[in-house]
Amino acid sequence: LVGLSGSERRRIHELSGGQQQRVALARALAPEPEVLLLDEPLSNLDQALRETLKVELKMILRQLKVRAIYVTHDQSEAVTMGQRVAVMRQGRLEQIATPDRLREAPKNVWLAQFLGHPNIFSEQSLSNATGIQVQGPAILRTDLISLGGNVAAEVLSYENQGSLIQIELLIPSWGLSVQWEGFAREVPSNIYPGKSVSLHIPDDAWVELGRK
């Protein structure tokens, strides 16, 4: 189950870091626990091995139908492993939700910053923006922004990140610059700094935040 067949007689110092973690997992699963606590189980492994083991670990837990509480400081691990994710701040629970819900609707400004939202706007910055219905503070979801619409914008910067394109846009009617990310195949090749474009930004792209 944990991929250690044929290693029964090997000593601990003869095992790799990944194999040692598999031994620890097998020992934890042997008593058939109802709930398994995993505290930073992959933190001492290199990146490539972490990526492999977190997928394997999730499959094993799902196969055995074992509930697990998985503690980690790695956001990508939390999103990969968790059906529900709880974010703690100085010992206090900030929010618990599915990974998608957490990303799409963080509870407050601190959580939005912690999750790395690129477009976080204060109440003051939104108060002078024309045509925006939210009061602020708020985030603007980049995944709901698309090219082609009735919001005029100017490209400030353009960064090719391989399969993704990162674009900074100035929206004159709002007096705000926003970050937008799109798949390279969906972004026209004639986008460049200084070019005027139009954006579609639906009302539900705005998510109001609590202040604390």
Predicted regions and their residues:
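ABC ATPase nucleotide-binding domains
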Residues: 1-107
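Gly/Ser/Thr-rich beta-alpha loop segments that engage phosphate groups in nucleotides
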Residues: 19-20, 118, 164
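Residues that scaffold the ATP/ADP-binding catalytic core of kinase and kinase-like folds
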Residues: 45, 105, 114, 148, ...
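Short, conserved beta-strand edge motifs with alternating hydrophobic and charged residues
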Residues: 88, 112-115, 138-141
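C-terminal boundary and immediately downstream tail of ABC-type ATPase nucleotide-binding domains
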Residues: 104-128
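Non-catalytic connector elements of ABC transporters
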Residues: 129-212
